[in-house]
Regions:
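Catalytic center-proximal scaffold of phosphoryl-transfer enzymes
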Residues: 1-252
């Protein structure tokens, strides 16, 4: 009979310390003289996953019961035992709220099946990096908002490529001013109503300047330029959705 502590240590070793099961098996034999096959350790991990599944589902339901979600997906390499010796590019999908719970879901691909199943008929505000798959999931009233950090990144790339590009520098400065509004609200610990009032006061003029600057830049930019892509229209709702963050990097 194995103790719970050994099983927990195995799971923590695999997922928190990134120590694969074959290595843990070898370490147990080397350090303790205990022979446990990788398959045995794998069975433990799978059983723990089964026991935690109801908890993960409860967290999912809690997230979907709210009005605001952030979503992101991170590529992970998965070792395949198909004889080719190459890794498969899978994805770890993350759903959560700032300073709230985060649920991770592993999927072998980046298609819409994963978020469609996870989100169900969610009709709140979903914020992402702008990945188009999120436009075709959720309930009929769901609003797909985007992330100013990802928009800003494009203009940072333009500044790095062309340091003297006044249009790109101006856009980065304006977007930074949007982040400063949220930083001011967080520093003052404003509630949602006060945050909305602050955004309503300061954001509209900035958004107009950003939109005008982007329109002007796109009129002269080459198609392959970092300034050429058209921003998603949901990004202009920043002033109205005061409960949404500027970005999707608020998992803690």
């Amino acid at each position: 009979m194995v103790s719970d502590r050994i099983v927990i240590d195995t799971v923590v070793g695999k997922y928190a310390d990134h120590c694969p099961l074959y290595r843990q098996s070898a370490m147990l034999e080397r350090d303790s003289g205990v022979e446990l096959s990788r398959q045995t350790l794998d069975d433990w991990v799978m059983r723990v996953g089964e026991l935690l599944a109801p908890l993960a589902e409860r967290l999912r339901q809690e997230l979907l019961g709210g009005s605001y979600l952030q979503a992101d997906e991170t590529p992970v390499g998965v070792q395949m035992h198909d004889g080719r010796g190459s890794n498969h590019l899978a994805y770890l999908w993350q759903y959560g709220r700032p300073q709230g719970a985060v649920v991770f879901e592993f999927r072998m691909g980046r298609g819409r099946e994963g978020p469609k199943r996870f989100l169900g008929n969610f009709n709140g505000l979903l914020q992402s990096d702008g990945y188009a798959v999120y436009d075709s999931v959720g309930g009929p009233k769901m609003v797909h908002a985007c992330c100013w950090s990802h928009a800003r990144r494009k203009f940072i790339e333009a500044v790095k490529l062309h340091p003297g590009d006044a249009a790109a520098v101006r856009l980065v400065t304006h977007i930074d001013a949007l982040f400063a509004i949220d930083a001011e609200a967080c520093l003052a610990k404003l509630d949602q109503a006060a945050r909305h009032a602050l955004r309503s006061q300061k954001a509209p003029a900035l958004l107009e300047e950003i939109q005008a600057a982007m329109t002007a830049a796109r009129a002269t930019a080459l198609p392959a330029s970092a300034l050429a892509p058209k921003p998603r229209i949901t990004r202009w709702r920043f002033g109205r959705n005061s409960h949404a963050s500027c970005n999707t990097r608020n998992w803690s």
